[in-house]
């Protein structure tokens, strides 16, 4: 497929962007139980607006706790069933490995694999996340980056293209500034 015929996507991190993170000592952690998996306000509407504008919406999430045995694959799948039921995402890409894996953010592997699978042009696509790993993965994949500043104690390695307070604000900015 030629670049002109390829699709545009918005890649979304999961924890802290779509659902509430468990905060400990200024750092975000993924929920470990389905009952802790709460979709943030305005997320379903924001994703619907992106889809109405013609974007694919693909979740890219590191879930190292599953790989370490701290959370189960069954719980992760139940969370993603809940996510799919409440938010109209096109795909959910998961890496349970850890830093050594090419798919584990900040490495761009999940974005590159999804782009291949969905015929996505990364040069006109966007990564939205709440951590330095998301910004770095988006930059490495050649995407525009939006950083959701949740006030975490960790710093960024690279400067995001845009900084916003939540996903609905990011989507308003994307739809206002990018021709679709």
Where are these regions (language model features)?
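Asp-based, Mg2+/Mn2+-dependent phosphohydrolase catalytic module
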Residues: 2-8, 73-91, 100-127, 131-180
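Short, surface-exposed alpha-helical recognition segments that flank or form part
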Residues: 34-38, 71, 102
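A short acidic, helix-capping loop that chelates divalent metal ions and anchors anionic groups
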Residues: 27-30, 65-69, 98-102, 154-157
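Substrate-recognition element of Asp-dependent hydrolases with the DxDx(T/V) motif
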Residues: 43-80, 89-98, 138
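Active-site neighborhood of HAD-like aspartate-dependent phosphohydrolases
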Residues: 2-58
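Conserved protein kinase catalytic core
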Residues: 19-21, 26, 68, 136, ...
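Short loop/turn and capping residues at structural boundaries
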Residues: 22, 61, 93-95, 126, ...
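Short, solvent-exposed loop/turn segments at secondary-structure junctions
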Residues: 17, 64-65, 133
């Amino acid at each position: 497929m030629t670049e002109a015929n390829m699709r545009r996507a918005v890649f979304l991190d999961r924890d802290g962007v779509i659902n509430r993170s468990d905060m400990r000592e200024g750092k975000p952690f993924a929920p470990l139980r389905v009952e802790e998996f709460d979709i943030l306000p305005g997320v379903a509407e924001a994703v619907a607006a992106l889809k109405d504008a013609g974007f694919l919406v693909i979740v890219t999430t590191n879930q190292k706790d599953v790989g370490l045995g701290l959370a189960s694959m069954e719980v992760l799948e139940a969370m993603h069933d809940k996510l799919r039921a409440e938010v109209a995402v096109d795909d959910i890409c998961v890496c349970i490995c850890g830093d050594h894996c090419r798919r584990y953010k900040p490495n761009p592997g999940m974005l590159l694999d999804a782009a291949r699978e969905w015929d996505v042009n990364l040069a006109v696509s966007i990564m939205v996340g709440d951590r330095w790993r998301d910004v770095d993965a988006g930059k490495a994949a050649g995407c525009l980056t939006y950083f959701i500043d949740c006030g975490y104690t960790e710093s960024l390695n690279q400067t995001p293209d845009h900084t916003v307070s939540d996903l609905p604000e990011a989507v308003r900015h994307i739809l206002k500034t990018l021709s679709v």
